Amino acid sequence: MRIALVGTRGVPARYGGFETAVEEIGKRLAAGGHEVTVYCRRPRGSRDASLPAEYLGMRLVVLPAVRARAAETLTHTGLSVAHLCRHGTDAAFVFNAANAPLLPLLRAARIPVATHVDGLEWKRAKWSGAGRRYYRLAESLAVRWSDALIADAQGIADYYRRAFRAPTVQIAYGAPVLDPGAARLGELGLTPGGYHLVVARFEPENNVLTIVEGYRRSGAELPLVVVGSAPYAHEYTASVHAAADGRVRFLGGVWDQDLLDQLYAGAVTYLHGHSVGGTNPSLLRAIGVGAPVIAFDVDFNREVVRTAGRYFANAAQVATLVDEAEADVDATAARGKAGLGEAARYDWDEVADQYESLARRLGQLRSSGRRPSGRRSRRGDE
């Protein structure tokens, strides 16, 4: 089959969950004999497409985008959809419900499409007013114009059922189970079990500020290592830095996956503040190397870590949990081992098989069939 993956920054995966999913799923589909095309954004600062024509068996189509928060995704996906409509494919996977206004073009080209709806983007603090209204409208359009909807967590599936009476295909991400070692931690002046870790974009709904404030209130002897940044959140980033004390180390973005895996594996705890997405790849990566997890208390995180995790809702609880982790390192390490057991439920091979099965169903479509209207039910704002 010809399968197109549209709506992300593309591969090689350097940025977020969608890109990791595209790489892990796409390379497996390609290895299975499918012709996989991945639409990629032109790297920043490059007039020429500096990506290869092929990567891990996937064909790459590199296109530009307007570098602005409100326009980057949609402009790149618009160019990708135009290219795809000219060249055709048997099935398309569009990532991010924000791209839903472009779905009618794919339908007009008779390309069956499944939309991965992502999390509840309209709840993110960076969107207000028109931006928030746009994301809520985009959810409705995705329901109306997709041949299938993909949810990566039960909570997301429940939301679409409640808000739109719309069925979804539930496919999570994978959690690679790794033993990355610790040979490179010395490059950062770190030792295994000698630090707490945060990995997140600096955005309010990821609760990096809450974690840093809570850590500062704690009596922790081990440093807090913070990995991440945000290209459009300068004010929030400044507030995070202002909240830190001398025990907090900011590393910025770490794009070296081997080094990042060693950071996860060597952490005495991994603090995870994400609150509005679905199944989060950073959380899966952490449990896959046995990092003990302290997570923000929402159903998406509890669905992944279950009883192996500890959960917080505010800075005071972060302080308590960090102190408890250092006070009983054996119990903390045992929770990390329990998390490894949960990681076994998230297997990239199984995820890719589910995408392949859905692609085959899409490819067999003769007509769009009856889709939900896209109208919100009265309970849809919950």
Task: Tell where the protein language model's regions lie, with residue ranges.
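Conserved donor-binding/catalytic core segment of Leloir-type glycosyltransferases
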Residues: 4, 187-217, 225
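Nucleotide-activated donor-binding/catalytic signature segment of Leloir-type glycosyltransferases, i.e.
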Residues: 237-258
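N-terminal strand-loop element at the rim of the active site
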Residues: 8-15, 28-68, 155-157, 161, ...
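An aromatic- and histidine-rich active-site surface loop
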Residues: 72-85, 89-118, 122, 278
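A charged, aromatic-enriched C-terminal amphipathic alpha-helix characteristic of glycosyltransferases
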Residues: 32, 330-360
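Acidic donor-binding loop of glycosyltransferase active sites
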Residues: 262-278, 291
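Membrane-proximal helix-turn-helix segments that form the acceptor-binding/catalytic region
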Residues: 131-149
